[in-house]
């Protein structure tokens, strides 16, 4: 369950930002994760809740939003969402090429915003 280490990293980043801005309370953290990032949202949410339970971050809301996969064809440069949406080797709807696509989005994992007091 690598979500535990992801939660630890998120909490370290959150604590750094809180210190940087002189804030004492975390209200909400929004995390954006790509469909190909291998993050299990329920596991990350549970890890976040457990790790913040007895801290000043207890009760903070973790909002997660998934970014869909977007590929760019290496042959015709068309951008498309594969079907199924987790397929990295899908035929390009423009030219039919199946291999060598560039992942434009879908692998990211980052904090989009923090709501602090």
Swiss-Prot record:
Q: Per UniProt, where does Ni(2+) bind?
A: 2
Record GO biological process: protein maturation; protein modification process
Task: Write down the Pfam families for this protein, in alphabetical order.
Answer: HypA (PF01155)
What cystine pairs are annotated? none
- Keywords for this entry? Metal-binding, Nickel, Zinc
One GO molecular-function entry: nickel cation binding
| Positions of Zn(2+) binding | 73, 76, 92, 95
Keyword check for 4Fe-4S, yes or no.
Answer: no
Q: Which domain of life is it from?
A: Bacteria
Query: What is the protein's known function?
Result: Involved in the maturation of [NiFe] hydrogenases. Required for nickel insertion into the metal center of the hydrogenase.
HAMAP family, sorted: HypA_HybF
> What family does the entry list?
Belongs to the HypA/HybF family.
Protein known as: Hydrogenase maturation factor HypA
Q: Which organism is it from?
A: Solidesulfovibrio magneticus (strain ATCC 700980 / DSM 13731 / RS-1)
Gene that encodes it? hypA
């Amino acid at each position: 369950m690598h979500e535990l280490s992801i939660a630890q990293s998120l909490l370290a980043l959150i604590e750094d930002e809180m210190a940087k801005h002189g804030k004492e309370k975390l209200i909400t953290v929004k995390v954006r994760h790509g469909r190909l990032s291998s993050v299990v949202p329920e596991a990350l949410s549970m890890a976040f809740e457990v790790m913040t339970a007895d801290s000043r971050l207890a009760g903070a809301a973790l909002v997660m939003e998934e970014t869909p996969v977007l590929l760019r064809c290496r042959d015709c440069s068309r951008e498309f969402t594969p079907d199924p949406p987790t397929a990295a080797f899908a035929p390009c709807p423009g030219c039919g090429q199946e291999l060598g696509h560039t992942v434009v989005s879908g692998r990211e994992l980052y904090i989009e915003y923090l709501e602090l007091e």
